[in-house]
């Protein structure tokens, strides 16, 4: 295949149960993913983002400004779950996956649909912050429980938030 987008369009014609998208990083792939979702296909895609809220901004930023609002509405109706994951080195020499996520409930969709899509990311990240489910919150707990070194924790916790 010449691109992720071409592969995605080809996959839709085969009527798969699940479509995996290695990485959504350009307009063509993002558009093909939304179109696949609009036709009822279950798609799982990856993006490099630091928070679930940033994912909306990054995805919508791939679309030209003249269609961004309509793609925001389509995306909001299609996205079910956003997960961000990092691997943290533990004191036993291993790594542990640490995740933050948002489940796109009908209530959350209704709230977001009444706002500008430019505010969605902040709103989502604020929910996660208030619930203390951010990656940095979990890493701090790991550090406080002596599961990771301070130097490892410092990779995920901003200096101003790191306990003395």
Where are these regions (language model features)?
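Short, flexible helix-loop junctions that flank or precede catalytic/ligand sites
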Residues: 1-164
């Amino acid at each position: 295949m010449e691109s992720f987008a071409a592969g995605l369009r080809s996959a839709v014609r085969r009527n798969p149960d699940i479509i995996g998208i290695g990485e959504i990083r350009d307009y063509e792939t993002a558009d093909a993913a939304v179109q696949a979702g609009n036709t009822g296909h279950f798609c799982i895609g990856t993006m490099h983002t630091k928070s679930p809220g940033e994912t909306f901004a990054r995805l919508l930023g791939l679309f030209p400004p003249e269609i961004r609002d309509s793609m925001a509405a389509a995306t909001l109706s299609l996205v079910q779950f956003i997960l961000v994951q990092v691997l943290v080195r533990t004191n036993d020499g291993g790594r542990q996956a640490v995740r933050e996520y948002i489940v796109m409930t009908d209530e959350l969709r209704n709230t977001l649909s009444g706002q500008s899509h430019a505010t969605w990311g902040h709103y989502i990240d604020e929910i996660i912050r208030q619930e203390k489910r951010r990656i940095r919150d979990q890493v701090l707990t790991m550090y406080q429980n002596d599961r990771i070194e301070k130097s490892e924790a410092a990779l995920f916790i901003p200096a101003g938030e790191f306990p003395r």
